[in-house]
From Swiss-Prot:
GO CC field: nucleus
Keyword terms: Activator, Developmental protein, DNA-binding, Nucleus, Transcription, Transcription regulation
Source organism per UniProt: Nicotiana tabacum
SUPFAM superfamilies: SRF-like
Function: Transcription factor involved in the genetic control of flower development. Acts in conjunction with DEFICIENS (defA).
Keyword Lipoprotein included in the entry's annotation: no
Span of domain K-box: 82-173
Further details from the record: Mutations in Glo cause transformation of petals into sepals and stamina into carpels.
InterPro entries, alphabetized: MADS-box/MEF2_TF, MEF2-like_N, TF_Kbox, TF_MADSbox, TF_MADSbox_sf
GO process annotations (BP): positive regulation of transcription by RNA polymerase II; regulation of transcription by RNA polymerase II
Name of the protein this chain belongs to: Floral homeotic protein GLOBOSA
Segments forming domain MADS-box: 3-57
Pfam families per UniProt: K-box (PF01486), SRF-TF (PF00319)
């Protein structure tokens, strides 16, 4: 029983599509190698998967094959791309040259060729630049003053806290000294003979003895 004809259309199932791609890709690359060997042909095959991954085979240098293709067909594959790239490069060069000229004018160089209107525009540009510089300078000064004020306030707060700690330490030391003094006084009075502890306000007590 012969094989049925396979309908050529996109395989919807992604797994089946990947399996079919791998098999047929390997088959194409194998055939390309075979024909290059059997027939001494110059073959180049490039395959891009839907994922963007590339597979290739080239019997000789791909650059040599492309050069031969250009010579035989008279067409270059990247003429349009190169033309767009050249245009972009020329535009960048022109913009750079104009910027260099404007920079020299802003420095006061090469201004003899400028007409009155161009000189007025240059003056406006310089005035605007000077205004921007002054505004930026004022902003920086305000920021520096604000930062200095904040640092001074923080320093004052730290000094106040330090004074409070010193006062608390001094009070604590004075309290400890007072406690030691009272303790020593009590011990001294306890050890003193009774006769020496009689108050001078009552001299008659000694006469009674």
């Amino acid at each position: 029983m012969g094989r049925g004809k396979i309908e050529i259309k996109r395989i919807e199932n992604s797994s089946n599509r990947q399996v079919t791609y791998s098999k047929r890709r390997n088959g194409i690359l194998k055939k390309a190698k075979e024909i290059s060997v059997l027939c001494d042909a110059r073959v180049s095959v490039i395959i891009f998967a839907s994922s963007g991954k590339m597979h290739e085979f080239s019997s000789t240098s791909l650059v040599d094959i492309l050069d031969q293709y250009h010579k035989l067909t008279g067409r270059r594959l990247w003429d349009a791309k190169h033309e767009n790239l050249d245009n972009e490069i020329n535009k960048v060069k022109k913009d750079n040259d104009n910027m260099q000229i404007e920079l020299r004018h802003l420095k006061g160089e090469d201004i003899t060729s400028l007409n009155h209107r161009e000189l007025m525009m240059l003056e406006d540009a310089l005035d605007n630049g000077l205004t921007s510089i002054r505004n930026k300078q004022n902003d920086l000064l305000r920021m520096m003053r604000k930062k200095t004020q904040s640092m001074e306030e923080e320093q004052d707060q730290l000094n106040w806290q330090l004074r409070q700690l010193e006062i608390a330490s001094m009070n604590r030391n004075m309290g400890e000294i007072g406690e030691v003094f009272h303790q020593r006084e009590n011990e001294y009075q306890t050890q003193m003979p009774f006769a020496f502890r009689v108050q001078p306000m009552q001299p008659n007590l000694q006469e009674r003895f």
